[in-house]
């Protein structure tokens, strides 16, 4: 009996000692957040240099670094439609020093086209905030003379098969084409390995038209090499004000590609709040706004990190259904 009492007292003492240490253990993240940031931050992009994600990262990194008082270094980790870079961030130490700049494809679309995705994005990332929006552009090349609007394109599809190129399988341009196919089935998706070949073949008349993120098509449209029949944003974009929205022909047809910042899921909320504040300051800078506009991106932020987290989860569910219904699978 004495041994039992001694053992019980020892256990209680150990428990009391553990409870006494709890405030210290809990204070570590808070202290780290108080001192954040104290060293350079890596901003990972899941694509090679020169694409829309990379351009956005290099636009925002200097302003973000200035707001935080440390260097923000862009790091390209390309592959698997951005998933390789995203996975690297998801598995990084959640201390705010390794962040992901991502559009909708790497953490909404591409993982849902994989048989065994390496992460579940709504769970494995914590949103910081959105920084910009850009629509898809629906444009036609020289093969479709007389087609000036999306209504014209859909009418032409009643009489003949229409081929629309994109930068590859499973991206937002491809899924936009799948939504058009639901309206008019006589549309064929022609995937290419990248924006460059898709644009070249559309200009050369090998396909009828193209659906792509606006930035790679912007100059071709401005120089009238391609005819934009619609942008898929809710409202017309300022830098192509004469191009109608898809909703003007198809009410409710709204497809926007966002660009935003994310951290690993267990990053302290206090660190997320500091990053959100710094991002807001950077995006509000006139120079950043001008650079985004020149890249055919519209500065855009949500009310809070939590609001962007919900937008991410909602988009994941919405596009997951489109991917499943279309039977889209990543093949390379």
Task: Give, region by region, the residue ranges found by the protein language model.
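Beta->alpha turn/N-cap motifs
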Residues: 101-106, 166, 195, 212-217, ...
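Bacterial N-terminal signal peptides
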Residues: 16-25
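N-terminal (or domain-start) structured segment
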Residues: 31-124, 161-163, 169, 182-211, ...
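Hinge/capping helix and adjacent helix->loop/strand transition within the periplasmic-binding protein
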Residues: 91-97, 112-197, 246, 251, ...
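An extracytoplasmic/periplasmic, membrane-proximal ligand-sensing/linker region
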Residues: 38-40, 222, 269-332
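A ligand-binding cleft/hinge motif common to bilobed small-molecule-binding domains
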Residues: 105-116, 178-183, 209-242, 320
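N-terminal export leaders
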Residues: 7-17
